[in-house]
From Swiss-Prot:
Domain of life: Bacteria
Functional pathway: Metabolic intermediate biosynthesis; chorismate biosynthesis; chorismate from D-erythrose 4-phosphate and phosphoenolpyruvate: step 5/7
Identification of the protein by name: Shikimate kinase
CC terms in the record's Gene Ontology section: cytosol
PROSITE patterns: SHIKIMATE_KINASE (PS01128)
Origin species: Bacillus pumilus (strain SAFR-032)
Residues binding Mg(2+), per UniProt: 25
């Protein structure tokens, strides 16, 4: 059954986008708890569906296979659900169909982090991020800047530099509630 997508703004899925390692999953879980909504990490759901990790999928089936699975899952989620907090993988928003579906049916929040602060997280990120493997720091910065441009289409940008996940989640919840109050009158 397809949901009528002319739903009130407060019932839309909240989609978190941003570069890998910015904290989409951690912050998304906190926001979901505070708003009493279900949390969906797209990468984790794809891993469950195919019974393999994203790095294994890249290695065994290729990036194209993963990107197709990602697109199918996200577009369906946007078109057929509501009241979810959704964390997209860092590269998902590169796909136009995903971007269109998210912007049409959901509220999209860009979690932004400076290159300098992201670089400090690199040691804990690199192992499980196949797209970073075999890249120099300059190539990673180029990817970071390229993706940042892709994330420029969003409903709201949330600066995360020097903030704890809890602080970011509280800011998001407060901002959403204010917006919902304004749009429901």
């Amino acid at each position: 059954m397809k949901i009528n997508r002319e739903i009130p703004v407060r019932q839309r899925n909240i989609v978190l986008i941003g570069f890998m390692g910015v904290g989409k999953t951690t912050i998304g879980q906190l926001v979901a708890k505070k708003l009493y909504r279900d949390f969906i990490d797209v990468d984790q759901e794809i891993e469950k569906k195919y019974n393999m990790t994203i790095p294994e999928m890249f290695q065994q089936k290729g990036e194209a296979f993963f990107r197709q699975a990602e697109k199918d899952y996200i577009v369906d989620l946007c078109e057929h659900t509501q009241l979810k907090i959704v964390s997209l993988g860092g590269g998902a928003f590169k796909q136009e169909e995903i971007k269109r579906a998210c912007l049409k049916h959901c509220t999209v929040l860009f979690l932004d982090l400076s290159w300098e602060n992201w670089k400090q997280r690199l040691d804990i990120l690199i192992e499980n991020r196949p797209v970073l493997h075999n890249r120099t720091l300059d190539e990673m910065k180029e990817l970071f800047e390229e993706r940042r441009e892709i994330y420029s289409l969003h409903n709201s940008r949330v600066e995360t530099d020097h903030l704890e996940a809890e602080e970011v989640a509280n800011y998001i919840v407060d901002t959403l509630k204010l917006g919902w109050d304004l749009y429901s009158k």
